[in-house]
Amino acid sequence: MLVLLSCAKTMSETSKVKVPLKTVPRFQKEASGIALQMSQFSVDELERLLRINARMAVENYKRYKAFHAEDTSELPALLAYTGIVFKRLNAKDFSKEEFEYAQEHLRLTSFCYGLLRPLDVIRSYRLEGDVVLPEPGNQTMFSYWKSRLTDVFIEDIKKAGGILCNLASDEMKSLFDWKRVEREVRVVTPEFQVWKNGKLASIVIYIKMSRGEMTRFILKNRIENPEGLKSFSWEGFEFNESLSDEKKFVFTNGKEI
């Protein structure tokens, strides 16, 4: 089984964690070209383009200007992203064998690097899927990557057993020909819901935390099939069979928030 996670907006440039190997992103050339184009924008342009504040615009202006420098720091993707999902995944305590297993059974989407393996070494950036760049052809990042990623993604899933556990945000489907993905492999999408005001609701913070915890559960326990996902339990979240079907696995928390 292969797990898909979304990249995070927040990134780190340092880590003391040792990994068994470091790999080059399969779309390094494309990422380099994207970063070069992004480096042509001014601070004000980045602020508007990425919908970020002035401080973050300055930070990412510096990142893109330094992207191709030899001394720019870089980290394995699994350690570089620091959003809520990755904090809960907590790969800092992974063993050598767990990192190696993750390398074969986890993929991370990236608007800059396309599709990453956990130990692919990357540099810090900020990018959104709706950003349009002139080369090639004034395409959004979604359109740019779709034709490049779909074959590789499907091949990765098949190598990992032909089953995808989709724990990425919904917008990431647009990076691929998702209908084709669903035709060629089995896709299971876990959902996480909590009780609020007497109704089940999807709350972003709980979704992100649960995605990270489930990914950790899968990698630590080497879950190879959807049936194994049903035993996931965390902070009151349990598999809810009555709300689930073969494509959608719903996990609910019985506590009112």
Question: In which residue ranges do the predicted regions lie?
Answer:
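Internal, well-folded beta-alpha domain core
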Residues: 91-245, 250-257
